Amino acid sequence: MQPQTQLRHLNRQVQRKLTQCLQLASGYFNRTFSMPTVHYNVRGMKAGVAYLQQNEIRLNPILLLENSAAFIQQVVPHELAHLIVYQVFGRVKPHGEEWQSVMQDVFHLTPEVCHQFDVSSVTKQRYPYQCQCQTHYLSVRRHHNIQSGKAIYFCKKCKVELILQ
């Protein structure tokens, strides 16, 4: 199945999970909550982000494709819990007792703060540079700055210039 087709299929599953969790929250708090907008534009190692005032959830499409079942089971309720907490309690600690309570008491899930997904496919490439005491792994930007002569980087420990291995 093509990634776009897969993502459309997974979007339906995400919407079903959101509907299920919203029903649980509505029953628990005896009030209605509106369906959040969902976007698939988070990049890097983050699985998802909740935008409280916009009632919006942004998800990482690559991590969703690679870990669909666990992602829908854990990340979607995690981000929705942030929105529910904001609407019920206002501004509080992101993973504080209110959020943990929504995860445990409302969604019946363990309140995990960080995901455990393999992020090797979404991590940025690093370039190995050597000094006298260790190997440093520099970002693409720093590597290009060195290669184009825009920057020179030194080791903080031994004060020697870093050289590409």
UniProtKB/Swiss-Prot annotation:
The active site is at E79. Its main location: cytoplasm. InterPro entries: SprT-like_domain (IPR006640), Uncharacterised_SprT (IPR023483). Keywords: Cytoplasm, Metal-binding, Zinc. One of its GO terms (cellular component) is cytoplasm. The keyword rRNA processing does not apply. It is found in: Cytoplasm. Binds 1 zinc ion. Zn(2+) binds at H78, H82. Gene3D superfamilies: Metalloproteases ('zincins'), catalytic domain. Residues 26-162 form the SprT-like domain. GO terms for molecular function: zinc ion binding. Its cofactor is Zn(2+). Coiled coil: none annotated. PROSITE patterns: ZINC_PROTEASE. One of its GO terms (biological process) is response to stress. Belongs to the SprT family. This is Protein SprT. The gene is sprT.
